Amino acid sequence: MPKEVIVESFELDHTIVKAPYVRLISEEFGPKGDVITNFDVRLVQPNQAAIETAGLHTIEHLLAKLIRQRIDGMIDCSPFGCRTGFHLIMWGKHSSTDIAKVITSSLEEIATGITWEDVPGTTIESCGNYKDHSLFAAKEWAQLILKQGISDDPFNRHVTS
């Protein structure tokens, strides 16, 4: 008989969240006491907007670099299939506020300081879909998201600075 599982993200009521936000999904504890934290980094409002794949792909590549420059312990930052944001997996305990500040700072750099030469992993050797990138779209989305501010609470807007 298959094991009964509950997928947390499918239990979240996507109609009541207020993006953009960072939400702590879970803290997982390993057998030796290691902690892994999983965050919902929601950049656009579910079922109202979706970031096109080329822009999302470029944001993904940039966040892989920029987050690691700002905070230790990043394991992975992967886009949601719905294209509204990312899962951010981290070693150790981190607050939604700290992660929201890191994401804000990273998006500020994308919006204002990044050139094509700064985008990592854009060659046929380093990317599985290297033709599907758009720095223009990444910058446009970063600016739109920053205008709204990133909240550390998914249900009540509390924008971090």
Curated annotation (Swiss-Prot):
Keywords: Autoinducer synthesis, Iron, Lyase, Metal-binding, Quorum sensing. Coiled coil: none annotated. It catalyses: S-(5-deoxy-D-ribos-5-yl)-L-homocysteine = (S)-4,5-dihydroxypentane-2,3-dione + L-homocysteine. InterPro entries: LuxS_sf, Metalloenz_LuxS/M16, S-ribosylhomocysteinase. GO terms for biological process: quorum sensing. Its EC number is 4.4.1.21. Signal peptide: none annotated. SUPFAM superfamilies: LuxS/MPP-like metallohydrolase (SSF63411). Its cofactor is Fe cation. Transmembrane segments: none annotated. GO terms for molecular function: iron ion binding; S-ribosylhomocysteine lyase activity. Binds 1 Fe cation per subunit. Fe cation binds at H57, H61, C127. Belongs to the LuxS family. Involved in the synthesis of autoinducer 2 (AI-2) which is secreted by bacteria and is used to communicate both the cell density and the metabolic potential of the environment. The regulation of gene expression in response to changes in cell density is called quorum sensing. Catalyzes the transformation of S-ribosylhomocysteine (RHC) to homocysteine (HC) and 4,5-dihydroxy-2,3-pentadione (DPD). Homodimer. This is S-ribosylhomocysteine lyase. The lineage of its organism: Bacteria, Bacillati, Bacillota, Bacilli, Lactobacillales.
